Amino acid sequence: MLRSGYAPSGDQPEAIRRLVEGLNDGELHQTLLGVTGSGKTFTIANVIAQVQRPTLILAHNKTLAAQLYGEMKEFFPENSVEYFVSYYDYYQPEAYVPASDTYIEKDSSLNEHIEQMRLSATKALIERHDTVIVATVSSIYGLGEPASYFEMVLHLVRGDMIDQRTLVRRLAELQYTRNEAELRRGSYRVRGDVIDIYPAESEKEALRVELFDDEIERLSLFDPLTGEVISRIARYTVYPKTHYVTPREKLLEAVEEIKVELKDRLEHLRSQHKLVEAQRLEQRTLFDVEIILEVGYCSGIENYSRFLSGRAPGEPPPTLFDYLPDDALIVIDESHVTVPQIGAMYRGDRSRKETLVEYGFRLPSALDNRPLKFEEFEARAPQRIYVSATPGPYERAHSGAVVEQVVRPTGLVDPEVEVRPASTQVDDLLSEIRFRVQGGERVLVTTLTKRMAEDLTEYLMEHDVAVRYLHSDVDTVERVEIIRDLRLGKFDVLVGINLLREGLDIPEVSLVAILDADKEGFLRSAVSLIQTIGRAARNLHGKAILYADKVTQSMQQAIDETERRRAKQIAYNERHGLTPRGITKSVTDILEVSIPGGSAGSRKQAARVAEPGAGYKVAKPSEAARLIKQLEEKMYAHARDLEFEEAARLRDEIQRIRESALMA
């Protein structure tokens, strides 16, 4: 059920109708060409609501995914809206550098909160049809075999017969750990015939199983922090702690297959007189096998995933796509970036692993622990809609028809584009900036090199212009703060090299200046120019100036496309008597990244209890993970001592740090 205070307008109704019609007609590829500010997300939400199908939305980075997740939560408050991104705060893959004989061990920091959300996403696909999952390209990486995962679930029904020892053994098979001191996600505790389980995919609720004479007498959901019972239930399904669970008999079969491959590989290495590599491989593999037999898993178990899932050599790994129902829909947002990203993942992963195999760090089967190849993604992905203001060649070649959404509901038209000589670009820019600043408007300037951006910033400062320089070293949170300051008028001009990234749609920006627009290359391609020109599309007086001594083919394409859209928008406004109106979003509204785990659309206070928060400033995600772990230990300690106010304060502080870290 779609909830919104707006009705589709402008090009939206026709775009929705055509996309829904295409889906119902079985079209595999469709493209929505939607200009900046035309309400592409709202259109997609309406399509999802009309076709009533499980949907996977792919974004090209975590920040964009978090924004889409927040918007979808607002549009579908009663649906199961989930978030599936990489659960690593920090990840250093295993690698070997032969030139210096350096082995780099795998090092990572897992974000438990995101891991919980990933498990929640696959659970939703199994249990509900009204699921919308927002994911990044990490969804093409290997995940546990769905058949094994489903086989391992534990169904608990009130009145069923099960003894305490059997229940505890089943939880251990699901990789839950026993913890009598504190109940944490993915753990359980036993107190006589009462067993408390904190499901790995649950955000806030734990399960209490009360047995009487080997019968499940009562099932209850309760708050793991306070112990308060929330509700009594008749049945509950406990899902494995991780996607990488395997039944014992399959595990034993896999171990035998690993030993067979090891024997063959050792013979091969010794025949080539690679004795050091052979010894290394034998030692490492037999150690892993021993650990697997003892506890059911080992560090780096994903390298043996081919055997655990029973696949043939070279066969693609199971991924999130294997969990999708047959009638699912895929929406690829910012497809001009996301589609090439999908294709690039496999190649980088392959070259690193081939070195590990060659030098005896891994068995050849480790090569099958990989992301999907692009052709495998194509074969697995169901019907899909590509969404972009500038669709790439792949989308255009595969889509039967491109559905255009050029007219904005606000009546705003694309900015006027002007070409001026590059020889006088700096002085001309200075006079344009002064004119815009007098009107209380802001300016974006994009240069080709870091050196030029720094020099220009220095020059503008010398001429009393309030200017800031946005460079690649600025992290996501700081970047958001810089944009906030620009919107608030703390400075008037933002200089950068690549200002295409999402989040730079700022209504106060009335001028975009592109220096050296005639220098062909990635930053001055037709797609890049159209995207950059679009940054001024949310202002009534929007204008783009391209400084160039000649008009290149890319420039001409960008100018022609902008003029085509502008003409269509003006004609629509005249036909319907529509007066363009500027966007008046508050600074908080447009900058807010709705973080998964919080309530959509509302910025949580850092602390909701009487005590002021400590105001921890987190520089890196890896630091955030360590700090969250420390604070969680303190929180549980306070809860055990019945100091619930202090525990609640720490819980809110953890939530604030988690929000900051997720934006990184």
UniProtKB/Swiss-Prot annotation:
Residue limits of the Helicase ATP-binding domain? 21-410
Q: Does the keyword DNA repair apply?
A: yes
Query: Any idea which UniProt keywords this protein has?
Result: ATP-binding, Cytoplasm, DNA damage, DNA excision, DNA repair, Excision nuclease, Nucleotide-binding, SOS response
Q: Which residues form the UVR domain?
A: 625-660
According to the record, the segments passing through the membrane are none
- Which GO cellular component does the record give, naming just one? cytoplasm
Domain of life the protein comes from = Bacteria
Per the UniProt entry, what are the Gene Ontology biological process annotations, in alphabetical order? Answer: nucleotide-excision repair; SOS response
Instruction: Reproduce the free-text note on domains from the UniProt record.
Output: The beta-hairpin motif is involved in DNA binding.
Name this polypeptide is given: UvrABC system protein B
Biological source species:
Methylococcus capsulatus (strain ATCC 33009 / NCIMB 11132 / Bath)
User: Highest lineage ranks of the organism?
Assistant: Bacteria, Pseudomonadati, Pseudomonadota, Gammaproteobacteria, Methylococcales
